[in-house]
């Protein structure tokens, strides 16, 4: 089942961050204490999935920022054809879904939304992939299900190429 009764917005003061609970204290704390401030300062941008009938209720969120990787860290499938210098990417710093919404496909939708946002930015400033730091093997395997590949030297850090994301966005009619 795919949950579709939501819309995305930049995090703001009117959004009820205190009632969000994804089951992970660190992610909850980031949303409650740091996400909006970081967004306003420009260090990391956070976007929230809001309930269409209650625009203060946060169902999920993701945070992104620009980053780069040393060429040697990047798997060959992504580095092929690139110059041998730092590889421009976007870091998916956090992605979480409220416990009440887990298992309804919102996490996948947020991943695609983050990918689309970063692809659009990359058209202006460059970038080839989404860099993901998985918290554990289970989360790592979830991202691998979308085509993410581990970095050469860090098995819980993955790259999801914009080529793969673009294909998924096209297939889902989200471009």
Curated annotation (Swiss-Prot):
<feature type="binding site">
    <location>
        <position position="145"/>
    </location>
    <ligand>
        <name>acetyl-CoA</name>
    </ligand>
</feature>
<feature type="binding site">
    <location>
        <position position="103"/>
    </location>
    <ligand>
        <name>acetyl-CoA</name>
    </ligand>
</feature>
<feature type="binding site">
    <location>
        <position position="141"/>
    </location>
    <ligand>
        <name>acetyl-CoA</name>
    </ligand>
</feature>
<keyword id="KW-0678">Repressor</keyword>
<keyword id="KW-0808">Transferase</keyword>
<feature type="binding site">
    <location>
        <position position="138"/>
    </location>
    <ligand>
        <name>acetyl-CoA</name>
    </ligand>
</feature>
<feature type="binding site">
    <location>
        <position position="142"/>
    </location>
    <ligand>
        <name>acetyl-CoA</name>
    </ligand>
</feature>
<feature type="binding site">
    <location>
        <position position="97"/>
    </location>
    <ligand>
        <name>acetyl-CoA</name>
    </ligand>
</feature>
<keyword id="KW-0820">tRNA-binding</keyword>
<protein>
    <recommendedName>
        <fullName>tRNA-acetylating toxin 3</fullName>
        <ecNumber>2.3.1.-</ecNumber>
    </recommendedName>
</protein>
<feature type="binding site">
    <location>
        <position position="107"/>
    </location>
    <ligand>
        <name>acetyl-CoA</name>
    </ligand>
</feature>
<keyword id="KW-0805">Transcription regulation</keyword>
<feature type="binding site">
    <location>
        <position position="133"/>
    </location>
    <ligand>
        <name>acetyl-CoA</name>
    </ligand>
</feature>
<feature type="active site">
    <location>
        <position position="143"/>
    </location>
</feature>
<feature type="binding site">
    <location>
        <position position="95"/>
    </location>
    <ligand>
        <name>acetyl-CoA</name>
    </ligand>
</feature>
<dbReference type="InterPro" id="IPR000182">
    <property type="entry name" value="GNAT_dom"/>
</dbReference>
<comment type="subunit">
    <text>Homodimer (in absence of antitoxin); has a condensed and elongated form. Forms a complex with cognate antitoxin TacA3. Forms a 4:2 antitoxin:toxin complex with cognate antitoxin TacA3. Forms a 4:4 antitoxin:toxin complex with promoter DNA, where 2 TacT3 dimers bridge 2 TacA3 dimers. Only TacA3 contacts promoter DNA in the octomeric form. TacT3 may contact DNA in the hexameric form.</text>
</comment>
<dbReference type="Pfam" id="PF00583">
    <property type="entry name" value="Acetyltransf_1"/>
</dbReference>
<dbReference type="GO" id="GO:0000049">
    <property type="term" value="F:tRNA binding"/>
</dbReference>
<keyword id="KW-0804">Transcription</keyword>
<comment type="similarity">
    <text>Belongs to the acetyltransferase family. GNAT subfamily.</text>
</comment>
<comment type="function">
    <text>The TacA3-TacT3 complex both represses and derepresses expression of its own operon. The hexameric 4:2 TacA3-TacT3 complex binds promoter DNA and represses its transcription; both subunits are required. The octomeric 4:4 TacA3-TacT3 complex derepresses the operon. The shift from hexameric to octomeric complex probably alters DNA-binding, leading to dissociation from the operator DNA and derepression.</text>
</comment>
<feature type="binding site">
    <location>
        <position position="146"/>
    </location>
    <ligand>
        <name>acetyl-CoA</name>
    </ligand>
</feature>
<keyword id="KW-0012">Acyltransferase</keyword>
<keyword id="KW-0694">RNA-binding</keyword>
<feature type="binding site">
    <location>
        <position position="105"/>
    </location>
    <ligand>
        <name>acetyl-CoA</name>
    </ligand>
</feature>
<dbReference type="GO" id="GO:0016747">
    <property type="term" value="F:acyltransferase activity, transferring groups other than amino-acyl groups"/>
</dbReference>
<comment type="function">
    <text>Toxic component of a type II toxin-antitoxin (TA) system. Acetylates tRNA and inhibits translation. Acetylates only Gly-tRNA on all 3 Gly-tRNA(Gly) isoacceptors in situ. In vitro acetylates mainly Ile/Leu and Gly. Overexpression during the lag phase of a tacA3-tacT3 deletion strain leads to a 150-fold increase in persister cells in the presence of cefotaxime and a non-growth state in the absence of antibiotic. Persister cell formation and the growth defect are neutralized by cognate antitoxin TacA3, but not by TacA1 or TacA2. Plays a role in persister cell formation.</text>
</comment>
<keyword id="KW-1277">Toxin-antitoxin system</keyword>
<feature type="binding site">
    <location>
        <position position="108"/>
    </location>
    <ligand>
        <name>acetyl-CoA</name>
    </ligand>
</feature>
<dbReference type="InterPro" id="IPR016181">
    <property type="entry name" value="Acyl_CoA_acyltransferase"/>
</dbReference>
């Amino acid at each position: 089942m795919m949950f579709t009764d939501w819309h995305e917005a930049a995090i703001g003061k009117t959004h009820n961050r205190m009632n969000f609970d994804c089951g992970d204290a660190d992610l909850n704390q980031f949303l409650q204490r740091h996400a909006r401030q970081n967004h306003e300062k420009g260090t990391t941008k956070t976007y929230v999935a809001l309930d269409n009938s209650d625009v203060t209720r946060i169902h999920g969120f993701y945070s992104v920022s620009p980053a780069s990787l040393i060429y040697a860290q990047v798997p060959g499938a992504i580095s092929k054809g690139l110059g041998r210098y730092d590889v421009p990417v976007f870091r998916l710093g956090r992605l979480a879904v409220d416990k009440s919404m887990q298992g309804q496909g919102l996490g996948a939708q947020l991943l695609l939304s983050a990918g689309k946002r970063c692809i659009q930015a990359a058209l202006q400033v460059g970038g080839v992939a989404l860099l993901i730091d998985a918290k554990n093997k289970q989360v790592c395997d979830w991202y691998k299900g979308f085509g993410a590949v581990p970095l050469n030297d860090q098995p819980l850090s993955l790259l999801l190429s914009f080529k793969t994301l673009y294909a998924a966005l096209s297939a889902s009619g989200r471009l």
